[in-house]
UniProtKB/Swiss-Prot annotation:
This is Lipoprotein-releasing system ATP-binding protein LolD. Keywords: ATP-binding, Cell inner membrane, Cell membrane, Membrane, Nucleotide-binding, Translocase, Transport. The gene is lolD. It comes from the Bacteria. One of its GO terms (molecular function) is ATP hydrolysis activity. The complex is composed of two ATP-binding proteins (LolD) and two transmembrane proteins (LolC and LolE).
Length: 227
C-alpha cells in the first residue's frame, strides 16, 4: 500500500474484564485511522488505556468487541497461526524495559527473532550486524546487555524489532527509563528509521517533546480518545 493511504482502521473497539462482580472497561468505543508512514503519539495519564490499545492494535491481546483492520483485513479473523504469522511479518515492538536476554550478546539478541523465523544463521547474523550498524552500535556487537548503557540497550531493542523488516513499529514508552539527552538521541534515531525504512510509528509516551515532534498526537482518558 502506498505511503499516506489508510493502513490501520479501528472501529468501535472495546476491551473489558470482570473483577469480582464488577465489569471494568479498559477501552470504550475507540475509533481511529492511521495512515501508512504516519507517526502517531498516544498520550494520557497512567491507566488511560494507551498500552491496552497498543497491545490490541499489535495483535498481542484481543478486544472484547470491535474491529482492527490492516489494509481492510480484520486481523482477528485470522485462523490458527495466521495472527502470529501476520504479527511476525508486519509488526515490530519496543518496550520501556528492553527485555534483552542478559546472557546473549547484542548481536545474538538481534539475531534471535530471525532464527525463530527459521532464517539461516548466516542470514540472521548478516541482518543483525547491518541493523546494529544502522543504530550506531557497530563497535558493541559482542557486548552483553549488562555491559551497555541504557540508551545502547534500547538501540539493541530497536534493532531487534526491525530485523524482520516490519511495516509498523509499536513503541511503549521507549524513552521512559532514560535521561533527557539519551531520550533525545532515541527520538532522533526513530525519526531517521521512519524516513529510511518508511515505517509507520505508533508511540505510547509521557514525553511531551517526543510527542510534539510526531505527525499526530492522540489524547486518551478513561479508555476513550479525547482528542
Amino acid at each position: 500500500m502506498s505511503r499516506g493511504a489508510a493502513m490501520i482502521e479501528v472501529t468501535n473497539l472495546c476491551k473489558s474484564f470482570v473483577s469480582g462482580t464488577r465489569r471494568v472497561d479498559v477501552l470504550s468505543h475507540v475509533d481511529m485511522k492511521i495512515d501508512a508512514g504516519e507517526r502517531v503519539a498516544v498520550v494520557g495519564a497512567s491507566g488511560a488505556g494507551k498500552t491496552s490499545l497498543m497491545h490490541i492494535l499489535g495483535g498481542l491481546d484481543r478486544p472484547t468487541s470491535g474491529d482492527v483492520l490492516y489494509d481492510k483485513q480484520d486481523i482477528f479473523s485470522l485462523k490458527g497461526a495466521g495472527l502470529d504469522d501476520f504479527r511476525n511479518r508486519t509488526l515490530g515492538f519496543v518496550f520501556q524495559f528492553h527485555q534483552l536476554l542478559p546472557e546473549f550478546t547484542a548481536l545474538e539478541n538481534v539475531m534471535l527473532p530471525a532464527l525463530i523465523a527459521r532464517w539461516s544463521r548466516a542470514k540472521a547474523k548478516s541482518a543483525a550486524r547491518e541493523l546494529l550498524t544502522e543504530v550506531g552500535l557497530e563497535s558493541r556487537l559482542s557486548h552483553k546487555p549488562g555491559e551497555l548503557s541504557g540508551g545502547e540497550q534500547q538501540r539493541v531493542a530497536i534493532a531487534r524489532a526491525l530485523v524482520g523488516s516490519p511495516r509498523v513499529l509499536f513503541a511503549d514508552e521507549p524513552t521512559g527509563n532514560l535521561d533527557s539527552n539519551t531520550s533525545e538521541s532515541i527520538y532522533r534515531l526513530l525519526s531517521r528509521l521512519h524516513e529510511t525504512r518508511g515505517l509507520t510509528l505508533f508511540i505510547v509516551t509521557h514525553d511531551a517533546r517526543l510527542a510534539a515532534g510526531l505527525d499526530r498526537v492522540v489524547h486518551m482518558a478513561d479508555g476513550r480518545i479525547t482528542g
